């Protein structure tokens, strides 16, 4: 199963989960508690799946099954900004493993309210673009996605990272927040008082193993 198929399945499951919360028919108090607890659980599960995908992709920055086709990992990062990054790697496009050909992978964060499902205006889509294919992304409840870049000497690089400084990137810190796409009522007597459960994750100094080749 390819990574894009996994993304689509995650998105479908998450949207179903949000809609399921609306159909609960238990008592008012129990329904409210259930909505909150399920919302928190969905946020955590969603965050776990997203982090798995990001860690997998980012750890392969500069990787190629045929090293001669990407001999210098220093040149693998093509663009680096606070909420977008483009780099070279060797992707598993058909579920059989990397094929030894260099691919480009581009992540970028869409605008608030573009997710299209649910009523949370803060939710965004994190797009993943493989080579020159159309942008693909799912409504996974992302509200914040921030990248911070460090040199080998732990100096922070200013974003957007200048073209001449891209080769200085040695590690990346990923910060990400997700929220419910559908609000849970806090009180039956005040239906307009709503809340969105949230979860936060930060990966400190993720470094591709391929940087060791420098």
Predicted regions and their residues:
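Short, glycine/small-hydrophobic-rich surface segments
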Residues: 35-36, 58-88
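Short linear sequence signals and composition-biased patches located at protein termini or domain-edge surfaces
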Residues: 134-214
């Amino acid at each position: 199963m390819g990574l894009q198929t996994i993304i689509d399945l995650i998105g479908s499951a998450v949207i179903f989960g949000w809609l399921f919360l609306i159909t609960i028919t238990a008592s008012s108090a129990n329904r409210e508690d259930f909505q909150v607890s399920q919302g928190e659980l969905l946020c955590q599960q969603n965050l776990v799946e997203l982090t798995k995908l990001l860690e997998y992709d980012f750890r392969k920055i500069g990787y190629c099954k045929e090293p001669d086709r990407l001999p210098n990992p220093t040149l693998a990062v093509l663009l680096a900004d606070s909420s977008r990054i483009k780099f070279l790697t060797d992707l598993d496009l058909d579920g059989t493993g990397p094929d030894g050909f260099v691919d480009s992978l581009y992540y970028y964060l869409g605008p608030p309210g573009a997710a299209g499902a649910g009523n949370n205006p803060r939710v965004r889509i994190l797009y993943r673009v493989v080579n020159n294919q159309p942008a693909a992304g799912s409504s996974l409840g992302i509200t914040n996605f921030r990248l911070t870049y460090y040199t080998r000497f732990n100096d922070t690089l200013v974003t957007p990272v200048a073209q001449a400084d891209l080769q200085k990137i040695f590690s990346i810190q990923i910060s990400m927040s997700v929220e419910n796409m559908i609000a849970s009522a806090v009180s039956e007597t005040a239906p307009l008082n709503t809340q969105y459960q949230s979860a936060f994750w930060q990966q400190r100094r993720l470094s591709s193993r391929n940087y060791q080749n420098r």
